[in-house]
Amino acid sequence: FTKSKARAGPRLPGARLKTEVIREINTYYLGAKSVNPDVDIDIVWVNTWYDPGKEAQAADVMIAEGCDMVAQHTDSPAPLQTAEKAGVLGFGQASDQYKFAPKAQLTATIDNWSPYYISKVQGVIDGTWKTGDYFGHMNEDVVQMAPFTNMPANVKAFAQKIKDGIKNGKYFAFTGPIKDNTGKLQLKDGEIADDGHLNSMMYYVEGIDAKVPGQ
């Protein structure tokens, strides 16, 4: 949907500089670039997880500067609502925001904590519960996708294919070769980023014309 050489953004990340946010910016860009090699991305840090006013203002500015696609790492539907008013498409974050912007949302990531809580409570009941880090995946339904909307059938089919590939482990966005935007090789040809790499990712991939804050 994004036009050649148009901006695809903005990113509207959260309160602290986190690998989670950097990783999602990179994923968004790699996905967009896979279907449009000329895509550009602009990044705006609003320094909050939830502030509808700031989120809407950032989206407004970016759209005025030429963004034709909006994505976010904040939690309110304000960016999508702003996009809808401007006739721009975008993606929701953390929950299905379709009811707030039915003409703008293409899909949204959905955080579904139920499987995690059920397994942990069951572990307490069984006496098998242990502390530790947890990394949930789409095949556990901890991360879900909202229905694909406002897109033609062929695009919907392509999106479903990618979603299925992620769930069954056949598609992984961070598969080398991948360089960062300084030209340093981060993943060799065919190498798949492991959890350690993903959770220490503090670089933008090649093609993103921006600096990670503080670097």
What is each PLM-predicted segment?
Residues 1-215:
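A residue-level marker of the well-folded mature domains of exported/periplasmic proteins
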